[in-house]
Regions:
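Amphipathic, hydrophobic secondary-structure cores in small proteins
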Residues: 26-51
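Short amphipathic
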Residues: 2-9, 34
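Short cysteine clusters
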Residues: 13
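C-terminal structural segments of small proteins and small subunits
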Residues: 47-74
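A generic structural signal for beta-strand entry/edge sites
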Residues: 3, 32, 64-68
Length: 74
Protein backbone atom coordinates (compact mmCIF):
# COMPACT_ATOMS: atom_id res chain seq x y z
CA UNK A 1 0.00 0.00 0.00
CA UNK A 2 1.52 3.29 -1.15
CA UNK A 3 0.66 6.82 -0.09
CA UNK A 4 0.64 9.60 -2.67
CA UNK A 5 0.28 13.32 -1.94
CA UNK A 6 -1.22 15.50 -4.65
CA UNK A 7 -1.30 19.32 -4.57
CA UNK A 8 -4.04 20.74 -6.76
CA UNK A 9 -4.10 24.25 -5.29
CA UNK A 10 -4.92 26.86 -7.92
CA UNK A 11 -6.91 24.38 -10.03
CA UNK A 12 -10.66 24.60 -10.43
CA UNK A 13 -13.39 22.18 -11.41
CA UNK A 14 -13.08 19.82 -13.17
CA UNK A 15 -9.25 19.67 -13.17
CA UNK A 16 -8.68 18.36 -9.60
CA UNK A 17 -11.00 15.40 -10.22
CA UNK A 18 -9.50 14.73 -13.66
CA UNK A 19 -5.94 14.81 -12.28
CA UNK A 20 -6.92 12.58 -9.35
CA UNK A 21 -8.59 10.11 -11.72
CA UNK A 22 -5.40 9.91 -13.78
CA UNK A 23 -3.23 9.39 -10.69
CA UNK A 24 -5.49 6.83 -9.03
CA UNK A 25 -5.59 4.69 -12.20
CA UNK A 26 -1.84 4.13 -11.79
CA UNK A 27 -2.30 2.88 -8.22
CA UNK A 28 -3.37 -0.47 -6.85
CA UNK A 29 -6.21 -1.37 -4.52
CA UNK A 30 -5.50 -0.06 -1.03
CA UNK A 31 -3.27 2.82 -2.11
CA UNK A 32 -3.98 6.06 -0.25
CA UNK A 33 -4.13 9.45 -1.97
CA UNK A 34 -3.98 12.70 -0.02
CA UNK A 35 -5.28 15.56 -2.14
CA UNK A 36 -5.01 19.26 -1.25
CA UNK A 37 -7.15 21.71 -3.21
CA UNK A 38 -8.35 25.28 -2.64
CA UNK A 39 -11.36 25.14 -4.98
CA UNK A 40 -14.48 25.63 -2.79
CA UNK A 41 -16.38 23.16 -4.97
CA UNK A 42 -13.84 20.40 -4.35
CA UNK A 43 -15.49 19.06 -1.19
CA UNK A 44 -18.84 18.12 -2.77
CA UNK A 45 -17.10 17.09 -6.00
CA UNK A 46 -14.74 14.62 -4.31
CA UNK A 47 -17.57 13.12 -2.25
CA UNK A 48 -19.67 12.60 -5.39
CA UNK A 49 -16.70 11.21 -7.34
CA UNK A 50 -15.90 8.68 -4.60
CA UNK A 51 -19.55 7.66 -4.45
CA UNK A 52 -19.64 7.16 -8.23
CA UNK A 53 -16.31 5.32 -8.53
CA UNK A 54 -16.45 3.21 -5.38
CA UNK A 55 -13.20 4.65 -4.03
CA UNK A 56 -13.26 5.30 -0.29
CA UNK A 57 -13.34 8.85 1.05
CA UNK A 58 -11.56 8.45 4.39
CA UNK A 59 -12.00 12.04 5.45
CA UNK A 60 -11.90 15.72 4.63
CA UNK A 61 -10.16 18.43 6.63
CA UNK A 62 -10.10 22.18 6.10
CA UNK A 63 -7.37 24.66 6.96
CA UNK A 64 -8.03 28.19 5.77
CA UNK A 65 -8.87 27.91 2.07
CA UNK A 66 -7.22 24.50 1.74
CA UNK A 67 -9.35 21.37 1.62
CA UNK A 68 -7.54 18.06 2.14
CA UNK A 69 -9.23 14.81 1.17
CA UNK A 70 -7.84 11.36 1.92
CA UNK A 71 -8.99 8.65 -0.47
CA UNK A 72 -8.28 4.92 -0.60
CA UNK A 73 -8.37 3.26 -4.03
CA UNK A 74 -10.94 0.45 -4.22
Amino acid sequence: MAKTSLDFKGMFCPMPIIKLSMAIRKGVSGDVFEVVCDDPGFEPDIAAWCNETGNILNGITKSGKDITATITKK
